[in-house]
Each structure stands twice: as structure tokens, then as C-alpha cells.
Amino acid sequence: MSFAPDALGFAPEWDAPVRYIDRTHAWYDALGTDNHYRYAQYADVPFTPLVQPLSACRVALLTTAAPYQPDKGPQGAGAPYNAAAKFYKVYSGDTAHDHDLRVSHVGIDRDHITDDADTWFPLPALRRAAAAGRIGALAPRFHGVPTNRSQRHTLENDCPEVLARCREDGVDAAILVANCPVCHQTSSLTARYLEAHGIATVVMGCAKDIVETCGVPRFVFSDFPLGNAAARPHDPASRDTTLELALALLEHAFAPRTTVQNPLRWAGPPEWKQGVLNPARLSPEELARRRAENARIKAVAQAVRDATLADSARA
């Protein structure tokens, strides 16, 4: 480790799960956002236990990652935040085929994301689980859930659509993999909705405070940078072990708000926690540049959203 341990073996005070609610508020305040965002918070949490063994269940994969769009600019590892690549409608894909999904459209930790899609889209691991008989079957489709700051839109539009598609596929349980801070809220709201309608769920994520503040039935927390909820990058063993935590939680959780923490540590230095979404680390010049960039990104995202909603209204 790159820090001196306490005499009693304590970790540094900052080596704890990042408080993303506080960080995002401070970050966007520094960027000039004038409205204080309220994250979803519930007192009660729905809970649907499995009614049959997991080895007999059909399991769906839900993601906030976006299909790669070659005409929308850089979207791979190292790409800047790309609002043009956002999506605002639920989409589905055939789980029998491979898919090129990216996460440049969301506010992940760009310094610690790689080209290893297994960290945010564990479709290969779920295929292996199905082949091994760990789950009864992988649902024929995975579903992409839009990341939307409007909780009302998520609850009134996207969640019912996801539920309808899961029911069409005969789904018994769903695994939801979150990426950015708002993705964690979206995944949590979707999990709650599915659970209230009889589908067992587990969220895999890295923003512990956002998920637990919203309140979900089951949560696998990996203390990794955002965008790595399903595995450590380029660590094949971590893909199946992290998924197994989610599968075991589906089987054995007996009450809502059950969180299991991934015992794996991030492979790199833990100091990433001090820098992520921390405006104090930016020079005045860099902060000014980020403010201008944020204004441009918001305009692009709004244009994409407006166009999507207009298309939906005409359909």
C-alpha cells in the first residue's frame, strides 16, 4: 500500500466508501449548477424472495451502459464524457450475441475505467453461470435502462417498460449493474419497482451511499471506482467471484436492505478515493474549463433527450 498503516492496523480515515451524494453536490456546486439535486430516499423497501431454487430461475441482466454509436465521437477508454452518446429509451439486446456497450455517456471515474467491458457488463459471466447450472437460464434479452436525473420519468416511464419486457421474457430475477452516481439511483429505483411487482433483484454497484439511501432489497457493493461494479479490470477470476456474490445474495437474503461487500480490494492505490469528483483538486483554470464544458454537455444531453421524447410522442 502507498500509505503508512496506523499502529493498530487502522486504515486511513479517507480509505472508506466514497460518499458520492456529498461529492456530487460539492462537484456540481463548484461547476455552477444552481439547483441542489435531491437523491431518492425511501423508508420502506419492497422484498420478493425467490419462490424456487436459483438453479431453476430465469435471470435477466439490466445495464445502464449504452450501445456504441460510431457516429457519436469517442466512447472508449480514455474518452471524455460524451453526452451525445446518451440514450433516453429502454432498449434490449439478444443475450446469445456479443454486444459493444460503452460507458462514456455517464459520469464515471474516467481515470480508472479501462476497455474491459466485463467490469460493467457481466454478460459472459452470466452465460457461464447458466452453462454451469448455477442459474436455470439466462433471459433471452438484456435490457438497457436510461440514466435520467428525473426520478419521476424513471418511475413512470422507464420502470414500467422494463417490467413489461422482463415479464415478456418470463424473468424470475434480475441483476442490475450500475455505473455513474445517477445510474446507481436509476438501478435502485428500477430494482424497487421490479421487486414490488414480484421479480427478485440484486443491484451491483460502487456508490454505496446512493443505493442504500434509496433503499433496495439486495446490494453487492464493490469498493472500486465507478464503472467497475462487476469486476476488477483485466482480472478474469474477479468476474465470476463478484457475480457469485450477487447470485448467493439472491438465494440467501431474508430481508430487504441486505448489503454484501465484495472482499476484493481495488488493485491500484486507494488514493483514487481522494480525487474522484473532488473540486478541491482542480486549479482555478481547470475549474473554469470544467464549468464551460459542463454547460456545453448539459445542452447536448438536453437536445438528445428532447429528440428522443419527440420521437416517442410521434410513435
Predicted regions and their residues:
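Metallocofactor- and cofactor-centric catalytic cores in central/energy metabolism, strongly enriched
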Residues: 2-234, 238-245, 249-250, 257-315
